Amino acid sequence: MDNFHLIKIIGEGTFGKVYLAKDKSESSHCVIKEISLTKEKEASKNEVILLARMEHPNIVTFFSSFQENGRLFIVMEYCDGGDLMQRIQRQRGVMFSEDQILCWFVQISLGLKHIHDRKILHRDIKSQNIFLSKNGMVAKLGDFGTARTLNDSMELAQTCAGTPYYLSPEICQNRPYNNKTDIWSLGCVLYELCTLKHPFESNNFHHLVLKICQGRVAPISPHFSRDLQSLIPQLFRVSPQDRPSVTSLLKRPFLETLIARSLYPEVCSRRIQSHAHMENMAIGPTACWRVSPWSAAYLQRKFEAQQYKLKVERQLGLRPSSVEPHPNEGEKLQSHWEETKFQELQYRKNKMKDQEYWKQLEEIRQQYHNDMKEIKKKMGRELKRVVKFEISLDKCISEEDTVQENEAVDKLNATLSFEDGTKFQEHRCKEEHEDYTDRAFEELCGPEAEGFFQDVIAAENRRQWDAGAPHTLLRIMAMADVTSTCPTMPDDGQVIVMEGSVENGKQWWLDVPGTPCALAAECACSGSLSASKGETVMIKPQLPKEDQEKVEIATGIMVDDEQLEPGSDEDDIKFEESEDELRSEIIESLEKLAASTEEAEQAPSSSKNAEEPGEKEKTNLPVKKLQ
């Protein structure tokens, strides 16, 4: 580690940490992967061996490895574009173009083909293990920590390895698998590029396994081509034998045209040269990917030398135009070469412009996100409020209360059953009814309802009818200043002659027992009143004409104690009459009674007039005959 300068930690993998470092001797950036030998000794050695064997433009380049303090450090190529998962997350819902998706897919497939040709299973192909370099234009496959080498192309592996979202059905079902499990994972990566989400998602691992075993995914957007839409279902076939291999994928017409653009120019020239000498030379599997840096320049110099030789021979006359089978062939070749060179220059210029454009677009997008974060932070500071809590240290909270509170919280976190849901609905309906009642009460409590409440309070404070016998009339008669005289015509027809003048007549006693109230109390509301002295005489009250007939029918009925009991609600009439009205009616009846007595004293014949209907009322009063 002394030869490297560690800059920062850029990630943590399955078996250790990953550092961004700088080589002190070459001053170039690199990635150092730290692996603990005590935990994953075999896996770390396997990764070093496999990376040392991999030499491909679409596989992360291996530089060196060393051990230090019981740890293994692997020095690899640094990809400045990050991994593919980070690139997908930066899209924020904006879909990739189909050309970009297919370009990355072809490059990943080429790297995977290079692995499968060497009988190696990656077993952990995912977007986090695919790295981007050269401004995101080149995709490279990395992280061979879970890779395994097979002894035969027909051999099957049985170890469960990989990331749950990218597991194949045969691994989930604990069945043997081969290189077709990497094809399933490759389909998951392609689906993420098309939809920006996982093909199989679930919060539960058991449900996720069930979805993977079914192999059903939602179709991608119809804006993509039919070739791409039909390719994804083929990669997600449940049976491994039905899935295509990497070689058959790259032979598809719409993918084969992109291979030339995905490879470097020197790789293309090397492939052309290798095909030309395929019949005479036995080229190893790795030779086609080893490219000499001077091959393209050599071909160009050879072509220029041939053209210069033909030109000199023509000028010297050593090679006339008639000798040539095609006189204009040299000119055609020269024009063709110039045209291809011009096209190549234009392609490079356009590529540089595209790279600058994407770089500027990425800077603008990053600046926009930074500005939005600052605005949200400012808004959060403005909306932030302080909440103060006051805790009394004198009062001790019992443990039972805390246990009860925790139980209440647990009940809220628990799932509601059917009975709990029914009770919750009933309680909710009751609360809504109470809310409506409270709203109605608030409306009544408004300024318009103040008079209504005053009337209700006044009605509650009014005197009500008692359950006993009424004494209102008797009390008024007891308080009134009344004088009584004897009638001149008794029932037996004899005339009572009073001694002396009217002023010397017998007066009512002022004692309380002689009053009608006391007599009524002593007689318990009987039909007749007895005076303390003298004989008892029934005096009929004077009634109006319209009630005379009713009184004549009811005169022969004696009043019993049962009739004085309070009647039912149907017998009560006019409860709204006030005491003032009753008092005024009683006073009027008493005045009429007094006037009738005065007329009886002045005219002896007034007894006849009293018998006429509707003039006077007869009242039973106690009288005493004069001797």
Curated annotation (Swiss-Prot):
Biased composition (Basic and acidic residues): 609-619
Protein name per Swiss-Prot or TrEMBL: Serine/threonine-protein kinase Nek5
Top-rank lineage group of the source organism: Eukaryota
SMART domains listed in its UniProt record: S_TKc
Catalytic residues identified in the record: 124 (proton acceptor)
Record field: catalytic activity: L-seryl-[protein] + ATP = O-phospho-L-seryl-[protein] + ADP + H(+); L-threonyl-[protein] + ATP = O-phospho-L-threonyl-[protein] + ADP + H(+)
GO MF term list: ATP binding; metal ion binding; protein kinase activity; protein serine kinase activity; protein serine/threonine kinase activity
Biased composition (Acidic residues): 563-580
Subcellular location(s) per record: Cell projection, Cilium; Cell projection, Cilium, Flagellum
Domain Protein kinase: residue ranges: 4-255
Keyword vocabulary terms for this entry: ATP-binding, Cell projection, Cilium, Flagellum, Kinase, Magnesium, Metal-binding, Nucleotide-binding, Serine/threonine-protein kinase, Transferase
Pfam families in UniProt: Pkinase (PF00069)
CC terms in the record's Gene Ontology section: cilium; sperm flagellum
Broad class of enzyme this protein falls into: transferase
Gene3D superfamilies: Phosphorylase Kinase, domain 1, Transferase(Phosphotransferase) domain 1
Cell division is among the record's keywords: no
Family of this protein: Belongs to the protein kinase superfamily. NEK Ser/Thr protein kinase family. NIMA subfamily.
Principal subcellular localisation of the protein: other
Disordered as annotated region, ranges: 563-582, 591-627
Requisite cofactors: Mg(2+)
UniProt xrefs under PROSITE patterns: PROTEIN_KINASE_ATP (PS00107), PROTEIN_KINASE_DOM (PS50011), PROTEIN_KINASE_ST (PS00108)
Biological processes per GO annotation: positive regulation of striated muscle cell differentiation
